[in-house]
Amino acid sequence: VKSTGKPVVILLVTGRPMTIAPETQAADGLLVTWHPGSMGGAALADVLSGDYNPSGRLSITFPLCLGQIPIHYNYKSTGRPHLNPDSDAKYLSRYLRTPNEPLFAFGEGLSYTDFSYSDLEVSSQKVKLGANVQVNVKVTNTGSRGGEEVVQLYLKDVVGSRTRPV
């Protein structure tokens, strides 16, 4: 199919992460559709034709290979200890001959346009248990097409008194 010169887009209908690195390298695009339901065909046609600009983000992580599993975005790296405990690296393994980063990480997603973030304001750098923090950010569509952006913010407990088991 690729030899025809036409763009090849993978529509991945799945309910879980899969190891799809070889397939994505051979394709020009990838759209994870999940299980779209009875109107999924029309919705996908709108996205593929450019009539609708996708703005979703992954709620899971797609591993690069089976050797990276399990990959959890919110668990301590007990099975893959960091060489430098102060490192912000998410994943580390001394046994894989492959990059430590997954193929597609939790929260990734693309759009037909571009956005810039500016003027980030956080009400507090430290948050006590049960307290609230207010965050403001200016989001600007810098592309040539209309679109929506999913703004994501993650907090990390650097020094937790208790951690959840994996």
What are these regions (language model features)?
Residues 13-148, 152-156, 164:
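Secreted, periplasmic, or luminal enzymes acting at the cell surface/secretory milieu
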Residues 3-8, 27:
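A short helix->loop->beta-strand "cap" motif at the edges of active sites that frequently abuts
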Residues 2-3, 21:
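Catalytic core of soluble alpha/beta enzymes
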